[in-house]
Amino acid sequence: LVFLALFIVAFTIRFPFFFRDYIDKDESTFILMGQAWADGYLPYLTLWDLKPPLTFGYFGLMITVFGKSLWWIRMGGVFIVSATSFMVYAFLRNNNNSEKKAFILALLSLYFSSLFGSVQGVMSEHISMFFYMGGLVVWGYAYKELTHKKWVLWGLGGFFFGLSAMSKLNLAYPILLCAAYISLKFLLAKGIKNTLILSFSSGLGVLIGIGVTAVPYLRENAFQEWWKAVFLAPRAYAVFHWNTAFLLLPIVGVLTFLLVKSLQKPQNKKSDKTNYPLVLLSTIGMLGSFIMAGKVNGHYLLQCYPLIFILCAWLGFERYLSSKKAIGLFVIFCVLLPFESYKEYGAIYKNKQVHGTYYNGEGIEIPAYLKKKQRPLDNILFLEYHIGYWILDKRPPTMAVTHPSNLFRNHLFPYYNKRKTAQEELSYILDSLKPAVIVIDHKNSIFKGRGVLETQFTKKMSQRYTKDTLIGKAQLYQILPFSK
């Protein structure tokens, strides 16, 4: 019943966003990568993006099972968010928290994982935390017993953790911290032999979780491509910035202080703080990974919300749970909070009245226009609204523009691209491939403020292309006849 309640709430909040062309560029990219996998082409071999393969595997699975449907892809997101929130509930119940408290915190985790910014789609953070919370719940249960005899559980938890890292690689940091802590705890309490059994079973689980994603590449004799994309390219992408460090280090310091305090207090099976160190270490590892990456995007925080609301259980607000006034205010808060969803319900209703369909956005309208006008569909460059490729059953012209922003990431080119610079890539696309149609944002072109690249793009467009039409924020350009 708890899962069903969470599922209904998640569905209600997220449903109006099922019909948007794209919610975040990353999700559109994942759909393209997943479609290629569903068509029989492994990630990184025909299209490329900087994420581990399991993220694309989700989209490929949904497309394979349900066909090309934004509805089903995002319905799967409802299940993932609901299940992750339910695992927050299960973790808290396993640590002797009341049903009411556990449900409230799970509900808040669900809300924050579905609202505020471009998180109503299915992000890699959603997928990774689904597996990570699975591992944390299993390890948390086994840790309460503090015995190596539950080696199957240690291995299963490790397997979930391995899968989580293959959805979002930064989770390797919290996994390593938790594993090191548990091993040290076992070493001090149970001796070397039992610690080795624990470490072997949990470590083997993690390695199996990682290794299963390499199997398809070994079969295709493409292990090197997997290795470069999963492990080498992310190292090149991460750039340490002091601004990010100064922002997050104070929070890490507070969490470390709480961790030290928690370790000073003896725990038992009936305590609600038995797994407190695991959650704190997970949060510290998560924030540490952001510091190492040098940036914090809004959707990165999706990985923190389940952990933060678990930590909130130890704030001690039990007395408010018996107050009808407090519960009433909380209900009102929950009703008012999803204002983005209410706004989107209005938008899809209006779109239905005007266009006869709930599906909306430039990524839907541009393909419809191109088909209606019988424009060439085999050679299109979407520099915005690139979900349009998927709607048209096409693929991006080169691997570097699978995600349009990857065009500017020269430091990643050595891991997948024959061309070494963005200028070379742009010249290849415009001079050799000569897209028949190019789509950009008419006000905020991705080349804006890019110096040499902006000049190069603007010059080529003025020489070879003419404006076709404006659809929403999308400006379509058509190649001039003499330029073909």
Q: What do the PLM-derived regions correspond to, one by one?
A:
Residues 8, 75-96, 134, 138:
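Transmembrane-helix motifs of polytopic, lipid-linked glycan transferases
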Residues 88-112, 129-130, 147-148:
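Transmembrane-helix signature of polytopic, membrane-embedded enzymes
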Residues 94-96, 133-156, 257-271, 316:
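Membrane-interface transmembrane helices that cradle and orient dolichyl/undecaprenyl
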Residues 117-128, 243, 297:
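Short acidic/glycine- and proline-prone juxtamembrane loop motifs at membrane-interface regions
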Residues 151-169, 175-180, 208, 283-292:
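Membrane-interface alpha helices of multi-pass inner-membrane proteins
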Residues 173, 293-328:
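Hydrophobic/aromatic-rich transmembrane helices and adjacent perimembrane loops
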Residues 174-207, 265-266, 310, 317-318:
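Perimembrane helix-loop-helix junctions
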Residues 180, 356-410, 416, 427-449, ...:
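Short periplasmic/luminal acceptor-recognition loop of GT-C membrane glycosyltransferases, typified by
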